[in-house]
UniProtKB/Swiss-Prot annotation:
GO terms for biological process: Golgi to lysosome transport; intracellular protein transport; protein targeting. Belongs to the adaptor complexes medium subunit family. Probable component of an adaptor protein complex. Adaptor protein complexes are vesicle coat components involved both in vesicle formation and cargo selection. They control the vesicular transport of proteins in different trafficking pathways. This is AP-4 complex subunit mu. It is a peripheral membrane protein.
Length: 530
């Protein structure tokens, strides 16, 4: 099926090269990189050169590539590339060039088990643990902290204290857990694992781990053992479009519950979500059952801020689950699942009927003086004053004929910075960065745009002054805007979705869990009255 798998950095240097079928020349990696560099923006993720098919994905400034002479489904190749990158991240703790080079022996061992003669075999982190025995080497903590976003997420709360290095560590660490199991696998256990491929990974992983460790669903989960913990991220991305008069034309939320599990024994867990949510995949629930949710089992959630609007319910347009939660939603918005070890997305959802935005944007563009435009941009934070965004970046396109530009800030100039950059890839842009804007606060940027008057002056020699001035002015106005916002708000859920509890089924022991919320912008655009 697949002949070669290799990883290149953004300079074209080979980090990993694995040849499965030996039917393609060894310089295929050089041919691939030369083609990518020559095509640049026109490159496609799948292409053919001299009868060789190349399929690749790019992650963390690295190229993950498959080559084959056969006609293989591209979607299959992309899925395997994504799974391979996920496995490498699970076993090396971070998907970086340095981590891969440091653990190249481990990665080659993983690739040997991943495919046999180019045919996919085992693509699950849990399943591969039975056959991989090389201990991972972890990058120094200082370097991990710079790559980790855990510390950025947790700066907004003073009750959760999670060192970043705990959230970035290899799954198969070879510590207390691996010394007792792994080497004492029975023949029956190994045969069960070998027979389970790609689509049945979760079940095989559960049987394997329970048989090797000999523990029940809640065995060994204690606060003293830091290896038994689970990290949960509730991430939401906003797509918002404001009209020139300030009304909302589009407001959509795309969210997911991302998990990273270090729990041993694959215990069955139950996750409870906010009862205010209505999912189209389940029937209407009796409101009297909402009081049955166990609010005392909230773990790792503190100071979570919700939108100030009193929204009673949200209708989720569509959602999808990970294979470990095959039964979907249970009564009272609970999800029962058995988490596999490593990174996985438990739930993805989309909300299109949202009527709340964390920022209110107003713009006003005037042209009172010839060859000058006055633009006023007002941004108001629409959330609790306890919430502080990590960053806010505002980009404002201006005409290409801009000769000079002046600006002034009404509030908080010490925490804000305005830069004007000419001849960027997107044209002339004004960048406005806001370091700190608490909830309920407002900031105003006033810009005076001075454009080159050569065009209008030459037109005035042949025609009356008024008509050319209107034409030129209307053309230049269309080159101003739209305004784009980029932001990230920690410990904030725009949809008010909250994780009410996370507990272990059939056991009184609660797993160690760390829950975080993050809301950021996918596309937040405001038009200008052109």
């Amino acid at each position: 099926m697949f002949s070669q798998f290799f990883i290149l950095n953004n300079k074209g240097e080979t980090i990993i090269f694995k040849d499965y079928r030996f039917d393609i020349s060894k310089d295929s990696n050089e041919i691939f990189f030369k083609h990518v560099q020559s095509m640049k923006s026109e490159i496609t993720p799948a292409f053919n050169i001299d009868g060789i098919n190349y399929l690749y994905i790019k992650k963390r400034e690295m190229y993950f590539v498959f080559t084959t002479r056969l006609l293989v489904s591209p979607s299959l190749g992309f899925e395997l590339l994504n799974r391979a990158s996920k496995i490498i991240q699970d076993y090396t703790a971070s998907l970086t060039e340095e981590a891969i080079r440091l653990n190249f022996i481990l990665i080659y061992e993983l690739l040997d088990e991943l495919m046999d003669y180019g045919v996919p075999q085992s693509t699950g982190t849990e399943t591969l643990k039975a056959f991989v025995f090389t201990p991972p080497k972890q990058i120094k903590s200082k370097q991990l902290e710079s790559d980790s976003i855990i510390d950025n997420f947790l700066k907004a709360t003073n009750k959760i204290s999670v060192p970043p290095k705990q959230g970035v560590k290899p799954i198969h660490s070879g510590s207390k857990n691996s010394s007792s199991g792994g080497s004492s696998l029975s023949t029956n256990t190994v045969s069960k694992v070998v027979n389970n491929i790609v689509d049945s990974i979760s079940g095989a992983a559960t049987n394997l781990h329970n048989s090797t460790s000999g523990g029940g669903s809640g065995s060994g989960v204690t606060d003293a053992d830091g290896d038994n913990e689970i990290y949960i991220d509730l991430c939401e991305r906003l797509t918002v479009l404001y009209s020139s008069n300030g009304t909302i034309l589009r407001n959509e939320i795309t969210g997911k519950i991302q998990m990273k599990s270090y729990l041993r024994g694959n215990p069955a867990l139950s996750l409870g979500l906010s009862p205010e949510f209505t999912f189209k995949t389940i029937a209407n629930r009796d409101e009297s059952n909402e009081n049955e949710i166990d609010n005392n089992n909230i773990g790792g959630v503190s100071n979570l801020s919700a939108p100030s609007s009193n929204t009673t319910s949200f209708i989720v347009d569509d959602c999808s689950f990970h294979e470990c939660a095959g039964s979907g939603f249970q009564p009272n918005n609970t999800i029962n699942f058995k988490p596999p070890q490593g990174d996985f997305t438990l739930l993805k959802y989309r909300i299109s009927n949202n009527n709340y935005t964390p920022f209110l944007v107003k713009t006003n563009l005037e042209s009172t003086i010839r060859n000058r435009f006055d633009l006023v941009v007002t941004i108001r934070s629409n959330f609790s004053n306890k919430v502080v965004p990590n960053f806010i970046f505002v980009s404002i396109p201006v005409p290409k004929s801009t000769k000079s530009l002046t600006h002034s800030l009404d509030y908080g100039s010490q925490n804000q910075k305005v830069e004007y950059k000419q001849s960027t890839q997107a044209g002339n842009l004004v960048f406005w960065s806001i370091k700190k804007l608490r909830g309920g606060m407002e900031t105003i940027l006033r810009i005076q745009i001075h454009v080159d008057g050569a065009t209008s002056s030459s037109s005035n020699n042949n025609q009356q002054q008024q008509q050319p001035q209107i034409d030129v002015g209307s053309t230049l106005r269309k080159e101003i805007g739209p305004i784009g916002l980029e932001f990230s708000i920690p410990q904030f859920s725009c949809s008010t979705l909250q994780i009410k509890f996370l507990k272990m089924l059939g056991s009184n022991i609660s797993p160690i869990r760390w829950i975080r919320y993050i809301t950021d912008s996918k596309s937040f655009v405001s038009r200008i009255n052109n």
